[in-house]
Each structure stands twice: as C-alpha cells, then as structure tokens.
Amino acid sequence: MASTTCAREVHYRGVRKRPWGRYAAEIRDPWKKTRVWLGTFDTPEEAALAYDGAARFLRGIKAKTNFPSPLSLDLNHLPSAPSAATAAANNQPHQHQQLWFAAPPPVPPSSDHHHQHHRIFLRTGVLNDKTSDYSSTEAPLYFTSSPNTATSSPGYQVVGFPMMNSSPSPVTVRRGLAIDLNEPPPLWL
C-alpha cells in the first residue's frame, strides 16, 4: 500500500486562506464581542503579523500570538536591510521579510484628548518590494481608538481599538495596496 503524504500548510491563529489564494486576518474583540477585520494579505506570515499586533494591542503581554514579541527579540542580531544600491549590485531578489521599528506619526489636534493618545500597528515589508530605505513619510496602517483622530493615505486603512497599554516601540510592517476584493470599491478609485 503506497503511503500518500499531503504537504500541509502552516496554519496561523487568526488567519484564513481565501479560495483565490490570499490570506484574511481577523481578531475577536472581547469587549464588543465582535470580529474585527484586519485585512487581506499576500502571505500567511503577513496576516499572522497583523493578527499578532492586534492581539498584543487588545490583550497586552498575555496575548496568544503566532510569533514571539518583537520586543523580546535581541535587536543586535537582526540583519539590517540592504540599501537599494547594494541590492541592485547583487542582482539577487531577497526572499525574506524585514521588520522596521519606527515611532508613530504625531497625533493631530483634537478636542477629545482621551482618544488621541495611541496609534500603533503593523506594516509588512518584503525586501524585494522595497526600492529605497524606510522613510517616516510613508503612511503605515494604524490602530486608533477614535476614527475622528485617524488620518490615512489612499491604500491604507484605519481600524479603531480601545487602548489597553502603551507600547514603547511599535512595530511597523509594510504591505501593498489595501484593496480588498471582498468589499465594494473605495470612493477614491
């Protein structure tokens, strides 16, 4: 009898594979008792990172995540991202992901000071998609506790969450256009 082995895909917490191959990430908000849509991603790792960021934001250090906390990583042993000139000189595509640690942008003025204190989220970045070094002018995807205080550029969405605790160094993860084929087209198209 021939044994058949099926190559099983790695399954991440909070991530579902869509029939057309993209990966959806969502998390359950325990206070509102609703599911919060985090977006669709090209790879399961990007979706898992989005889930991990939301889980840490909602549940703090006791959150069950797919990957270890970036704050627990030894930052001295992380490889640095090569410059565009170095990548062009090597003519080799990079097949791994790189995390960038950056501070959130300044908070716009608002009359409701309770909701404007914290914005944080992940932005996934794949080195072969990068043409230049990380710039703080690029608009990442943020969580905010009030949609009135959030600003985003086209291609990025803002998701609201209640603030649990502050994070000393937010993790940003770059991703492509935030167009979800499950939703109607955005008004700016």
Curated annotation (Swiss-Prot):
Transmembrane domains' residue ranges: none
Similarity field: Belongs to the AP2/ERF transcription factor family. ERF subfamily.
Region (Disordered): 83-117
Motif EAR-like (transcriptional repression) in this chain: 179-185
Record note on domains: Contains a slightly degenerated ERF-associated amphiphilic repression (EAR) motif, which may be involved in the activity of transcriptional repression.
Protein known as: Ethylene-responsive transcription factor 12
UniProt entry keywords in alphabetical sequence: DNA-binding, Ethylene signaling pathway, Nucleus, Plant defense, Repressor, Transcription, Transcription regulation
Domain of life the protein comes from: Eukaryota
Gene Ontology molecular function, alphabetical: DNA binding; DNA-binding transcription factor activity
Native species: Arabidopsis thaliana (Mouse-ear cress)
PROSITE patterns linked to this entry: AP2_ERF
Compartments it resides in: Nucleus
SMART domains: AP2 (SM00380)
Compositional bias of kind Low complexity: 83-98
GO BP of this protein: defense response; ethylene-activated signaling pathway
SUPFAM superfamilies noted in UniProt: DNA-binding domain (SSF54171)
